[in-house]
Amino acid sequence: MKKYQTHIILTIIFCMMAFAAHARRMSPRDAFSDSVMCLVFKYSQSVDTTGRAEHKSYAYTKFQIKTNKRNATLMLVPTMYAVAHGGGRRFISEFYNQMTLDANGRPVAKRLLNISTIPHRSNTLSSVLKYMTPTVYGETLFETNILSPFHYKNRRYYKYAVTQLPFGKAQVYVYPRLKNTQVIEARAIVDSQSGKISMVDFEGEYDMTRFYISIIMGKDGFGSLSPARCSMRANFSFMGNKITGMYTTVYGLPKILSDSLNNVADTALMAKVRPIELNQDEADIYKKFYEKRKQITDSLNNNTPEKNFAKDILWDVIGDNVLNRISQGFGKQNQGYFRISPILNPLYMGYSERKGIVYKFDLKGGYRFTENLELGLRFKGGYSMKQHRFYFNIPLTFNYNPKHNGYLKLEIGNGNRISNNRVARKMLGISKPEDNDFLYPLFSEYPGLSLPEISTDIDANNRKLTEFKDDYLRLTNHWSFNDYVGFEIGLVSHQRKAVIESFYKLFNYPSKYVSVAPAVALELLPWGKKGSIFKIDYEKGWKNLLGSNIDYERVEADAQTIFQASRRQSYSVRLGAGFYTRKGDHWDFVDYTNFHDDNIPGGWNDSWSGEFELLPSQWYNASDYYIRGNFTYEAPMIATAWLPLIGKYIEAERLYVSSLVVNHLHPYTEWGYGVTTRAITLGFFAAFKNTKFNGIGCRFGFELFRDW
C-alpha cells in the first residue's frame, strides 16, 4: 500500500487542479448568467418594504369566459352551474377591489363593485382569479401552489438561460428540470445591474387549468415586488368540457369610491373607475345581454309568464343548490354567512379500509354580532356504505373574546359503535379470566339458547349483538391567558345504548350506560400561537351525576407540531399518552378523547397525518392505557413526481410512520406512502403487530375542486 501512496496523492492533486482550471475557464456568458440570477434571487431582500403592510390600493379586473364545448358533467364543477345551464356561450364580468396585504404579505381583495352577464352574478372559475395576484419573488407563486423560479430555494427544480440585452437589460429563460404541475416555464426581462424584474411571462398547468400569464411589474420601491398589470389566458378542461377565460387586472389605482361599498352592481360607477376601455367584443357581449334583459322585462310587463316547473324549480333552484356549493352572506353589512357543500355531487366521497366508501357533506354558518361576538355552527356528516351507518358531528361555537381566544362550544354527535371492553378483548383474542364471568350465562336457565362464539373472526351481523350506539354531548369553555397558556373547563356526557338490548339482558347486564364527567384541560404553547401545542386533559365521571351510572377517571397528554420548511416541505409530529386512573364497578367502556377512530374521514389536509389507518377498531376500546406517536413528511416531489408520464400529475407526496403501545401490542406500527393529484388522493399502508407483518391496506379520496 505504501508504494502506491505517492501515486494516489499525486492523482488527487492533479484532479483538483483540473477542476480548478475548469472553474477558471468559465465562459463570460456563464459568468454573466450566474451574476444576473444571483441578483434576481436577492432583489426582494434589497427593497425597503417599510409601510407596505399598511399600504392600501385599488385594482380593476375584467374577464371574458367563452364556452367552447360543454356537456352535462359541467354542472358537477363548482361555480360552473350557471355557465353549464345558461343559454349563452360568452360572458363578461368586471370587478373593482380594494387591495391590502395579510400578515404573510399576500394580497387580500375586498370587492367593492361587481357587474356581470353571468346569471345571478355567480362567481365562475373563481379559483383562477388567484393566478392574477402572483408573488413573483416568493417561494410559491399562487398562495401555497406553484414553486416560483425566482426564489433562491427553488433553483434546484429549474434550469436558467440568460441573454444579454442592450441598455443594461437581460432576458431570462426558465425551464423546469422535470414535468410536474408544481413547476412552470417562464421568460423575464431583468435589470442586469439590480436584478429587478420589469416584465415576466409564466406558462403552466394546475388543477385542470392551463394558464398563460403576462405581467408588468411595478416600477419603484416595494411596488416593484408586485404586478402593476397582469393579463392571462386560462384554458379549463374537464370530461370533454372546454372553457376559455381571458383576464386582465390593473393594480395601483387611486381611491375614487367609498370603501363602504360591498359587491355593488352599478354600471355607472364601474364606468367611472374603469382604467381601460372595453374592446368591441366585450362591448357587444354587454349590448346583447342588456337587450335580452330588456326584452324579458317588456314581455313580463305585457304578459303573465307561465311557470316551467322543470326549468324554474328542478333546474334553476334544486339543480344549482344540490350539485354545487351554496355560499351566501346575509345581514345589512354581510354579518352572517352560510356555506353548504354539494349534496348530490358524486365527487365528495372517500374510501378507507374499515368504513369502505364514505359519502360526506359539510354545512357551515356564522353570524357576527359585534367585533368581539360571533356565533358559528357546523354540521359535518358522512354515510358509510360498508357499515350502513350515518355519522354526524355538530359543533355550535360562541366566540366572545378574540383577543384571549375565548369561546363557548357545544358539540353533539354520534360516535363510532363501541363494544363493551370485555367483548372487545375477546374479539381481539386477549381476554382476561374475569371476562368469562360476563361472557357465559347460565344456559340452564334458557333451554335451547344458542349464542354466537365471540372471537377474533366474529362476522358483522353477530358483532351487532355486542355493540353499543354512542351519542355524546360536550360543553367546553376555552380561554387563553396569553399567547403561551390556555385553559379549558367543561362537561362531557355519553349515552351508550345496546344495538340489541336483549343480548345484554341475558347476562343480567345493563343495556344502557350514561356517563357524565366534568373535564379540564391545560394548553401550553412554548413558542406562541404558531408553534407546538402541548395539552393535558383530565376527565372524571361521577356516578349518579345527572343520571350517570358509570364512574371513572382518565388522564391524557397530547403534543402536536407542524414545521413548515422551504419548497413546500412540512414535518408533522404528534405524540400522546393516556390512561385510566380509576375504574368503577361497571368499568365496561374504554373511550379516549385523543385516541379514537375518526368516523368521518377527511381529505388530504384533514387528519391523515395523525391517525392509524389499519388498526382494528376494537383496539381503541380494549386497553386501559396507550402511548402513540405519528410522524409525517410532505414535499411536492419525493419519488413519484420524478417518474416519466405519471410524475407531472403529482401535486404532493407524503411519508407516514405511526407507532402505538397498548396492552398486548408492544408495539403496533404503520408505514405509509401517499400522493395527491388533481383528481384523487391515494395512500398505501403496511401494518406490523409486535414487529410481525400484519397486512396492507389503502385509502383514497376524491380531491377534485378542493380549492374551488
Regions found by a protein language model. Give the residues of each.
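Structured extracytoplasmic
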Residues: A23-K169, L178-V183, Y247-G350, R463-Y484, ...
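Transmembrane beta-strand segments that form the barrel wall of outer-membrane beta-barrel proteins
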Residues: I197-G204, M232, R339-Y351, D362, ...
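Gly/Pro-enriched, hydrophobic low-complexity segments
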Residues: K159-D266
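C-terminal outer-membrane beta-barrel translocator/porin domains of Gram-negative envelope proteins
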Residues: Y407-G413, R417, V423-M427, K432-E445, ...
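Residues on the lipid-exposed face of transmembrane beta-strands in outer-membrane beta-barrel proteins
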Residues: Y359-G365, I394-F398, L475-W479, L491, ...
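Outer-membrane beta-barrel transmembrane strands
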Residues: E353, I357, G365, E445-V492, ...
